[in-house]
Amino acid sequence: MAKDYYKILGVDRNATDEEIKKAFRELAKKWHPDLHPENKQEAEEKFKEISEAYEVLSDPQKRRMYDQTGTVDFGAGGQNFNWDNFTHYSDLNDIFNDIFGGNFASDFFSGFGRGQREEQYDLDLYTNLDITLEDAYYGTEKRIKYRRNAMCPDCNGTGAKNGKLITCPTCNGTGQQRIVRGQGFFRMVTVTTCQTCGGRGRIPEEKCPRCNGTGTVVVNEDISVKIPKGATDNLRLRVQGKGQSYNGRTGDLYVVLRVRNDRNVQRINDDLMIDQKINFAQAALGDTIEVNLFREKYSLKIPEGTQPGEVLRIKGAGMPHLNGHGSGDLLVRVNVEVPKRLTQKQKDLIREIFDIKENHRSWFH
């Protein structure tokens, strides 16, 4: 006989989602098994029935199927509900917090066979590498020396002599240990990685003499890392398979670049800026000069009437675009040098050019 989920929760067939949730919360608090030690079995059945009804009526698709056919498909379980079908853990967690305090939902369902995943280890390594702006401009290769746990070459990371493994007697091959606290229906179950086998479920029948059963050996690495043109500060370079090894797996090495500032060159995204001195005549009359950037030389035209602090641009002479084509621009900020000492003839010529009267002689002393 089909169950009447609306009757179980005590709501009308046109009940809103909020009304269904409210009814479930009240009934779940009322029938929690640990609150009924005198008739715990009845409370367990009632609590499960309430949860089943809520699972169906709080899900639009399941509720629509139930309203149309009077039945619900719970997946692998068919029409039979079990705790693996329940998906509203956050709602139960709120209820448990009201009753007991703390975060109990995940531990509560562990008592019904919902185990936790095997503990995962971060096998990746990270290291910083300082480079110059010139290194980033041209691209280069740098050597890095470090130590890591590598897979034992004698046992291929199994930790077993001759590679022979047996089932772990502590966890019976599950890779996990379950610690149960409390009694009765409401049990606190903590699932941890097995300390004997490290979560593998198997242990060496006889330990590898080289690695003493760990599956790894410490090695000193000396590797070359390619720095791409256009490298930026905090850029992460991945060196595959050069991280830590554990349980037959090996992580990666991540090299984090630190691009040092250059006293003569300023980076603005992919544009580079330098300061260039020119004399008064070049600024006034114009000229073509040579500017230097690292190991490169570029020709730059100084227009007539160039002002101090004016920025001139050499297209495509800046920082190469990272992982792309082309480059930024080279920005040349012009600094006009004013001579500190002039001959009398030079002073007279300047006065004549700018029609400066004799009473302004102090300008040139």
UniProtKB/Swiss-Prot annotation:
Keywords: Chaperone, Cytoplasm, DNA replication, Metal-binding, Repeat, Stress response, Zinc, Zinc-finger. GO terms for molecular function: ATP binding; heat shock protein binding; unfolded protein binding; zinc ion binding. GO terms for biological process: chaperone cofactor-dependent protein refolding; DNA replication; protein refolding; response to heat. Binds 2 Zn(2+) ions per monomer. CXXCXGXG motif repeats lie at residues 152-159, 168-175, 194-201, 208-215. Its cofactor is Zn(2+). The keyword Zinc-finger applies. SUPFAM superfamilies: Chaperone J-domain, DnaJ/Hsp40 cysteine-rich domain, HSP40/DnaJ peptide-binding domain. The J domain is necessary and sufficient to stimulate DnaK ATPase activity. Zinc center 1 plays an important role in the autonomous, DnaK-independent chaperone activity of DnaJ. Zinc center 2 is essential for interaction with DnaK and for DnaJ activity. Belongs to the DnaJ family. This is Chaperone protein DnaJ.
